[in-house]
Amino acid sequence: MEENQFERTALLLGKASVERLARKRVAVFGVGGVGGFVCEGLVRAGIGAIDIVDKDIVALSNINRQLIALYSTVGKNKVDVLEERLKDINKNLIIKKYKCFFLPETSDTFDFREYDYVVDAIDTVTGKIELILKAKEAGVPIISAMGAGNKLDPTAFQVSDIYKTSVCPLARVMRRELKKRGVEKLKVVYSKEEPIKPQFEEGEEVVPGSVSFVPPALGLIIAGEIVKDLIRVE
């Protein structure tokens, strides 16, 4: 019998579901610590087409948590590195990459009606809000990542509606901004862990702390939610 790379997945999901995933197209906005692992989980599960969106360059400080960050990839475009990796996982994958940050001024680049699912793994509130509004306007399912920085407990993540979240500072801001814009619901993954205060030396740049095992957990939870949603028979 010919070997199939998705045969173990088919044992769990069923052959029809694996075939269904191969016909789906997902767009992942932001491919850093969270988004990179979303892509990894989706492609290894058998998603047939993926769009990846990010303007960032791999930096040395990314190595502690980002899938695509290695000494050999520092200085390269994240979407270029990720494209090569994902094509090496599934040679039949259809992949489209965009070297831009998603913001109101770049949003017209994308036709959201082409997507079966959208992932918000963006860092900025402005970008997140714009992406959510565009996906909602197009009637496309979207799942949004809340804060993964300043956290140590990968088991504290929960899948919820944005208006049922608590603790997470980013979720609090998003609730307020989405309510202003009339967004009634949004599927998110957020942490119930109280944020840890980073330990800065005087004069250091103020950025969130991060660790190797938290952003990947968030990304893989999101990938799992998407796969489960997409294989449900309509």
Which functions belong to the PLM regions below?
Residues E2, F110-Y117, I122-G127, E137, ...:
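Glycine-rich phosphate/adenylate-binding loop
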Residues V34-G35:
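Hydrophobic/small residue at the entry helix of a nucleotide-binding pocket
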Residues V28-G30, V53:
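Conserved N-terminal Rossmann-fold NAD(P)-binding element of oxidoreductases
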Residues M1-V26:
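N-terminal charged helix/coil linker that caps or initiates catalytic domains
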Residues K99-S107:
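Conserved SAM/SAH-binding loop
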